[in-house]
């Protein structure tokens, strides 16, 4: 309908304005386009995978890693078996593609204790710190002998 077309046009103007503001501010990373996310998953997961968040979850993790954010907490809601399969199932593939990635799935369900969740996050942060220190050592200028 005419009203729907007008709303789509207005929405696209708003999206472009937000993307421009984010680009100019240098404080935020502008999210990739839908088309770019579709290209990222080629050969990793099928576009037909529409369970849970489907291929988009994997694509967003790949986007984060390629944008310089290799430390990812993948929160899994209780009772969402498709998201659980796609989220956890793709982590090994992503770690093979991006060896320096640090992805940890955290299950949020009544059976998981808060302490267990916090410990898994702390472990992920410890690995992130260790990786950062290792990268600093590798990039440090070598002392002359």
Describe the function of each predicted region.
Residues 1-9:
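Single conserved hydrophobic/aromatic residue that forms the stacking wall/gate
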Residues 131-139:
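Transmembrane alpha-helical segments and their short flanking loops
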Residues 10-51:
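Active-site cores of enzymes that catalyze phosphoryl transfer or operate on phosphate-rich substrates
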Residues 34-132:
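Hydrophobic alpha/beta core scaffold segments
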Residues 142-145:
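Iron-sulfur (Fe-S) cluster-binding modules
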């Amino acid at each position: 309908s005419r009203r729907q077309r007008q709303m789509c046009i207005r929405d696209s103007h708003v999206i472009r304005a937000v993307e421009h503001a984010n680009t100019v501010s240098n404080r935020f990373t502008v999210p990739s386009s839908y088309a770019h996310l579709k290209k990222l998953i080629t050969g990793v997961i099928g576009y037909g995978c529409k369970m849970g968040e489907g291929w988009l979850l994997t694509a967003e993790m790949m986007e984060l890693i390629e944008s310089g954010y290799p430390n990812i907490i993948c929160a899994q809601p209780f009772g969402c078996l498709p998201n659980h399969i796609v989220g956890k199932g793709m982590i090994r593939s992503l770690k093979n593609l991006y060896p320096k990635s640090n992805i940890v799935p955290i299950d949020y369900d009544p059976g998981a204790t808060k302490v267990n969740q916090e410990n898994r996050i702390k472990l992920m942060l410890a690995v992130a710190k260790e990786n950062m220190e290792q990268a600093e050592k590798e990039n440090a200028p070598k002392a002359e002998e």
